[in-house]
């Protein structure tokens, strides 16, 4: 069942974010000082603790907002997504909360722990292909043949608005002297949503995106002036290993993001270590990217 994604103007996002229906399932996460890292750098570093969400990731926000915005007939038919990780779990939990069917197409190479996590949340797992692109193509076929609604991991204004509730929370939580927010970039939904709200509420704050050097799809898109498809992406930070960013997320980043930096694998590992030293939490590489 194909419900067209309604285009959104940039200045419409703040209101869409403020109306986002995420807190039935997500929680407002704390903004905590990284005491050890701050002392070492001689600068105050704050961390937004999205690892404390029910599925340990911000992805739940966008997935739930999308489902909560669908009409009853679409919910009755069910939803589908393609993902090898956090988006899959976010859609599965969101669907369980809304009591709707969720089909999750995952590559056959997906680690069993992630497959089991989706199944434990009630998702119907379909294993297909060796890579995300294969799973995505299969999901779009099943969307058409079974009358399901596809929940895109990033290139949908409702998903972007759900992720943008992090920006809404940051606007309330950040001290007045915060000068910059660093945001990991995969497909661009997280930074697009955060930038759309913070440039409205705290325009003086710089929004800086962070990508792995070997998966810098947004940097490539901005250099080309349009989304491009990378020939290859690294797999270390698999949560942000996207070959092509979204059309809408590209548009938002092009107009709202101040700067994008790229980091090597060694730097990502150092970020993971820094987070552990301050929180005793072990984050995945994509989670350590911003640090």
What are these regions (language model features)?
Residues 1-291:
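PLP-dependent amino-acid enzyme catalytic core
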